[in-house]
């Protein structure tokens, strides 16, 4: 247990260091965008005004309000202080609405869409890869070309393919939104059914993107394990094939858990693209609106939340991996 404790503390320290740099990048990157958001707000509010002095006063008022006229270092420490207290500021593009109000519902939509889809795609992909390695012949010959083809389709490509086929041509599913535009969010069966129907295309676009690569990886690892010396020895000793296969797939699964941790960031990025294409009311669509409106607080808040979701998912996967792989404890004990 001492070895695992050392492993846990090491991963926790890396999480804290990465989080610190995430704060810095989430503050700096939106401010590197061209344009002046305060000037855009002033122009929108002061439409029709011909008095340049009045417009300058408006500009100064909003620059003071948002703190954009303060030194960049002072802005950064103020940003850290506000975020620690759960205050992401006021939206530039939707003033005077607080950023936290905007992203509250978006987080729920994103979490409910992305993580079930990523985990489901990972499970299905690994199951298909294991079956292909074990059965070989026909199933393997069909699965491998399909998996290679699917794994090379980018996230936006898969989303567009499903949108065109099942949304535009067949009209089986709606093409945009999280629910019907004529509905108000309630717990009525009509609203719930609308959410389920709108959920399908974004969900399956993420699942299909995840399946291909996982199936290829699991097949390769399973074939390697099936040809290992301990499998041949076990068969020579007369151990039942079902028991041997259980050990084989357990060993083959360990690198796939690591692969999930490494690829979860890419998967989340692809899922955000799917949200944008389907106008799904998650963080991806909110982030797009923030970028279009040069909304520093909204962009910083959304990217920080996405980053933290990915970091925490990686951390949890690595901690679970340490529990299921005894080699981790042994290595840390040395």
Regions found by a protein language model. Name each.
Residues 11, 144, 160-161, 247, ...:
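Residue-level recognition of transmembrane alpha-helices
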Residues 2-5, 103, 107-139, 155, ...:
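Alpha-helical transmembrane segments of integral membrane proteins
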Residues 1-4, 65-126:
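An internal, D/E-rich "acidic patch" concept
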Residues 14, 120-121, 147-150, 163-167, ...:
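Transmembrane alpha-helical core residues of multi-pass small-molecule transporters
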Residues 19-74, 171-191:
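Hydrophobic alpha-helical transmembrane segments of membrane transport/permease proteins
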Residues 25-32, 79-81, 146-177, 205-207:
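Membrane-water interface segments at the C-terminal ends of transmembrane alpha-helices
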Residues 9-15:
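N-terminal signal-anchor/signal peptide hydrophobic helix marking the start
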Residues 53-85, 278-290:
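Short hydrophobic, aromatic-rich alpha-helical segments embedded in or entering the lipid bilayer
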